[in-house]
Structures are given as C-alpha cells and as structure tokens.
C-alpha cells in the first residue's frame, strides 16, 4: 500500500545515506582509482625535483649534499635516479614496491639527515613525501598498474 511504499523509499534513502557515511569496506575500483591518482600526482611532483637536478647537474654535482659519504656526484646521481627513474616506475605501477624503496630512502635522507637540524617548515615537504610513499607502499599499486596486469598474465600462464 501507499504507506509501505513510503516506508520502502525512506528505508532505501536511509540505506544509501548510511552506506555513504559509513562504508563497510572500500570499493576495489574506487580505491584503485584513488591510488592511481596519488601515483600520478606524487610521481610527477617528485619527478619535477629530479628533472631540476638533472638540468642543473653540472652546477650541483660539486656541491650536492653527501650525507652517506659516497661523494657529491654519486649522491646527486642516486637522488636523480630515485626522483626520476623510480618515479616513472611508480607512476606506471611497474615493479612498484621495488621502485618505491629508493624514493622512500631518498625522503628519509632528506628529512632525517640533510634537513635533520632544520626547522620543520624546511623539511615539511620531505616529510609529506615520506608519509605518502610509506602509505602507498603499504597499500600496493592497485589494479590500474602494470604490476597488476603482469600478475594476471603470469597467473593465467600457470593454469
């Protein structure tokens, strides 16, 4: 009857609102899209730092910080590798967790060593990158990644 239809509509609306406000679990596709967006955003941002270092290599190679005692030039090359090559793999989700290790290591060195005694405002960017990269490392690359497609292809060949 009319009252039952109204109750059904009200219950449906309340159910939608409840699920929106209190989701029981994240939707796989939505979560993977979020991870993809974060990979692209933070990968491109970190890559821009590597491009800047690469473009100014001649100027920076003699004076780049050497916190590991391996020389300014090698420290710069490793920073460029972490910020450019690994960022590219991170964006595409290729060897995702392996690529993230140098990125996380670079941000640890930047935050704890290079800017260790600086005020937080100076090292805040390295901290943000570090936290985001650790969280994304834990989350994994999502299903919109080369790793996901490679894993699917390898799994289908096992059968």
Which positions does each model-derived feature cover?
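Perimembrane loop-to-helix junctions flanking transmembrane segments
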Residues: 60-73
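Single conserved hydrophobic/aromatic residue that forms the stacking wall/gate
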Residues: 1-11
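Extended, low-polarity transmembrane helix blocks
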Residues: 10-55, 73-81, 85-88, 92-159
């Amino acid at each position: 009857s009319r009252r039952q239809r109204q109750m059904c509509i009200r219950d449906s609306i309340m159910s939608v609102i409840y699920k929106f406000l209190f989701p029981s679990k994240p939707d796989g596709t939505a979560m993977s899209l979020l991870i993809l967006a974060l990979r692209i955003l933070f990968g491109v941002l970190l890559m821009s730092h590597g491009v800047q270092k690469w473009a100014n290599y001649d100027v920076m190679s003699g004076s780049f910080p050497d916190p590991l005692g391996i020389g300014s030039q090698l420290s710069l090359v490793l920073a460029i590798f972490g910020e450019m090559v690994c960022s590219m793999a991170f964006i595409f989700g290729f060897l995702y967790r392996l690529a993230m290790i140098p990125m996380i290591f670079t941000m640890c060195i930047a935050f704890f060593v290079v800017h260790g005694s600086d005020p937080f405002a100076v090292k805040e960017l390295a901290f943000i990158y570090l936290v985001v990269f650790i969280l994304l490392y834990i989350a994994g690359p999502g299903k919109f990644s080369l790793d996901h497609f490679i894993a699917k292809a390898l799994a289908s060949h096992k059968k």
